[in-house]
Amino acid sequence: MRTTYVLHIIRSGRGTLEIHNQKYELTAGDAFLLCPDVEAWYEADWEDPWSYMWVGFTGYRAQEYAGHAGFTKRTPIRKVNCGKELNSYIDGILEAHQLSYTDELKRNGYLMLFFATLMEDYKKIVPAIVNQHSYPGSVYVKHAMDYIAHHYREKIKISELADYIGVNR
C-alpha cells in the first residue's frame, strides 16, 4: 500500500482505473489521483495503450493542495487542460535530480508551480470556486498590514490593497 499521493496525467491513449469498487475508462486529458492507503488498480488499454506522466508527493498540506486542484478520495479523476505546462514542471523536477539543497528547492518550486497551474485550471472548470477564500481572516489582515507598512508613504487605493491580498472582484 502506498504512503504518498501519486497524481497521473494521461498524455495519450486509453486505460482503466478501478478504485473504491468503481471502474473508470480514461483517455488523454484525464488525470487521476491515488491517495495514501487507498487500494487501486490500473492498466493500459491493449489496443491503444496510454502514455502518462505522474508526480508523487506527500506533506502536511498534500491533501489540501490536491483538493484545491479538484482531486479528493471521492472524486479521484478529472479532466485537465494544462498538460503541456504540467509536463514542463515534471521535466524540471526530473532535471533537478541531484541530492543538493539547490536542486531540492528547484524540485519543490516546480511542484508548487505544478499545483498552482492545476488549481488555476480547476477554477476554469468550476468557476464557483474562484471567489472562494480558503485562508482564515487573520491571514488576510496580516497581508493587508504588511502591504500598508511597505506602502504607507504612497497613496494607497483600496482596490490595490484588495488585489494584493487576493480578495478583489
List each model region and its residues.
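N-terminal regulatory/effector-sensing and dimerization cores
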Residues: 1-74, 99, 103
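Short, Lys/Arg-enriched, Trp-marked, Pro/Gly-tolerant hinge/linker segments that flank
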Residues: 73-84, 96-107, 116-165
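Amphipathic, well-ordered alpha-helical segments in soluble domains
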Residues: 6-9, 61, 85-89, 110, ...
